[in-house]
Amino acid sequence: MAFSAKTSGSDDLKAIISAISTLVEEATFVATAEGITFRGMDPSHVALIDISWPNSAFEKYECDSNIKFGVRIDEFTKLIKRADKKDSITISVSKDSMLLIDIGSNKKYKIRLIESSATDTPLPKISYDAKIELATTSFEKILGDVQVVSDYLTIKAKPTGVEFAGKGDSGEAAIDVKKDDDSMEALKVKKESEGTYSLEYLNPIVRAVGGAAGSVTCEFSDAKPLRVEFKVANIGRIHFYLAPRVSS
């Protein structure tokens, strides 16, 4: 068999698929000897997710030739949700274009692969002026605090700290996080920067990955896309790009 990947538990794969499901209904994965990658953009081209999962993250990994396989995310999600936390999950591709999913020692599923309609999506090439690293639990709470009153998050970064704010019809919210705050793991500001981003996109991706990620890094500049990196122990890279809100 040309391709087979086995996880030691189910949490990482669930986090990846949950993150992808916030943006797209169909996903095309690329498997090589180095690992599995995915890159996709939502239909409105507001958000992009880029995932790299190295072979070293798997309990067992085999890929003797490059392969692309496309799946419907809702179908894939239903199956991997049947796995308990400690269950291993093995995915492989059969000769008759089926994705084989083995869960634990006694569950076996097959789903039909779909034709890939994905095109190569380049990553934004941006030089950022502000970089913030926070505990994921703290960032998720901040987003929830702002979403109580607003659909958008405004981030203002200064060398001394960061303000997360939002404004809506019902009121306003502002959360200040100083550079020496326990939740602030790192702060680098070349230039004071401000950006406003949709919580409709940002909140679901943070919730999806949050449980598996210890920290989150946000990079932005004035009126530039937000770049979010999740640090997950067994996953090489999850990057999320979100276009800024443009004031009319």
Swiss-Prot record:
One of its GO terms (biological process) is regulation of DNA replication. The keyword Transferase does not apply. GO terms for molecular function: DNA binding; DNA polymerase processivity factor activity. Coiled coil: none annotated. The lineage of its organism: Archaea, Nitrososphaerota, Candidatus Cenarchaeales, Candidatus Cenarchaeaceae, Candidatus Cenarchaeum. Homotrimer. The subunits circularize to form a toroid; DNA passes through its center. Replication factor C (RFC) is required to load the toroid on the DNA. It comes from Cenarchaeum symbiosum (strain A). It comes from the Archaea. This is DNA polymerase sliding clamp. Keywords: DNA replication, DNA-binding. Sliding clamp subunit that acts as a moving platform for DNA processing. Responsible for tethering the catalytic subunit of DNA polymerase and other proteins to DNA during high-speed replication. Belongs to the PCNA family. PANTHER family: PROLIFERATING CELL NUCLEAR ANTIGEN.
